[in-house]
């Protein structure tokens, strides 16, 4: 299955045709798709109306610098700001993370989307792409926050996606623009980077997004192209039974597999359930690539959002304003 990107704030005729394709599981929205709260709500409805089957509509609404929808939405702080509170008051910090998750997820669901790809459970160890998106450099601290964040998302009826497996935080390179190689052995990764993923799986996380990082001591290809990582370690060793997403095949580090068809097939052959094709100019080629493949069409049904309030109901809910106030009082910033 594919999650695709669309070009603008309204669907084009070509994009409506794409949504008819059996392999299209849904759409990932970005800043380019956002003009206002009402517009993105209308776009979500248009996507569903254009497709003959349920569509999974997604966004990256983590907070901090990775927040695609801003005007009309809470200005969510980065996870690192919450993580910094853990040293002085762990219980308050974890409660705040759960509230952050509730606020983020409730606003995304009120806009007609199903999920935000969250939480980031990479360790905060200097990676250019991760930075303050991570809670902490300490695996046990990140593990505790991961469980809290999953609970907060689930309380709104949003599925939780752990990313980026098996851990993107220790390499320096940004896989959007560079190849990234992590030379560590599997035992070290088990003791460090895998710890938050184990906690998230135990907390009932619904999906995992793979990293485009290469771990040559474990497998020669990026993790998202690796049956060793997906089938043997994630599913076999860690017991994960949910949905496995690739990261975007438009990222530079994904090009090692070859052209667009080769990238799509490499992800699916390795065990990914869903391949992200976020750049609209790659969608036609990706759709041609999956013709004739057996696709796991049932995998995504459990990720469809449940129980949205709608914006009127959400703004009338005392928890919305109270959560904004708690974040403001605790972190000293307007949300």
From Swiss-Prot:
GO terms for cellular component: cytoplasm. It comes from the Bacteria. Gene3D superfamilies: Glycoside hydrolase, family 3, N-terminal domain (3.20.20.300). Substrate binds at residues 60, 68, 133, 163-164. Pathway: Cell wall biogenesis; peptidoglycan recycling. PANTHER family: BETA-HEXOSAMINIDASE, BETA-HEXOSAMINIDASE-RELATED. This is Beta-hexosaminidase. The gene is nagZ.
């Amino acid at each position: 299955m594919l999650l695709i990107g669309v070009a603008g704030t309204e669907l084009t005729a070509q994009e409506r045709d794409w949504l008819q394709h059996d392999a299209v599981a849904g759409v990932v929205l970005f800043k380019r798709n956002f003009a206002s709260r009402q517009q993105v709500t209308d776009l979500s409805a248009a996507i569903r109306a254009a497709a003959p089957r349920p569509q999974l509509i997604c966004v990256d609404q983590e907070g901090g610098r990775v927040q695609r929808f801003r005007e009309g939405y809470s200005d969510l702080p980065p996870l690192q700001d919450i993580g910094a509170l853990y040293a002085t008051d762990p219980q308050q910090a974890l409660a705040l993370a759960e509230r952050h998750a509730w606020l983020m997820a409730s606003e995304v669901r009120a806009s007609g989307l199903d999920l935000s790809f969250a939480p980031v459970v990479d360790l905060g160890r200097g990676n250019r792409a991760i930075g303050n998106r991570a809670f902490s450099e300490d695996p046990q601290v990140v593990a505790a926050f991961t469980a809290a964040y999953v609970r907060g998302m689930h309380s709104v009826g949003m599925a939780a996606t752990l990313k980026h497996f098996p851990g993107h935080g220790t390499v320096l390179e940004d896989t959007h623009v560079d190849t990234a190689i992590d030379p560590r052995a599997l035992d070290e990764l088990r003791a460090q980077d895998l710890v938050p993923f184990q906690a998230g799986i135990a907390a009932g996380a619904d999906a995992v997004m793979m990293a485009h990082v290469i771990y040559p001591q474990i497998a020669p290809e990026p993790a998202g192209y690796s049956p060793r990582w997906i089938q043997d370690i994630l599913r076999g060793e860690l017991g994960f039974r949910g949905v496995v997403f690739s990261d975007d095949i438009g990222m530079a580090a994904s090009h090692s597999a070859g052209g667009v068809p080769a990238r799509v097939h490499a992800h699916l052959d390795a065990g990914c359930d869903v391949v992200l094709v976020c750049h609209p100019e790659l969608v036609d080629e990706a759709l041609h690539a999956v013709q004739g493949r057996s696709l796991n069409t049932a995998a995504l049904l459990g990720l469809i959002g449940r129980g949205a309030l709608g914006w009127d109901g959400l703004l009338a809910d005392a928890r919305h304003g109270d959560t904004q106030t708690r974040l403001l009082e605790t972190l000293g910033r307007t949300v």
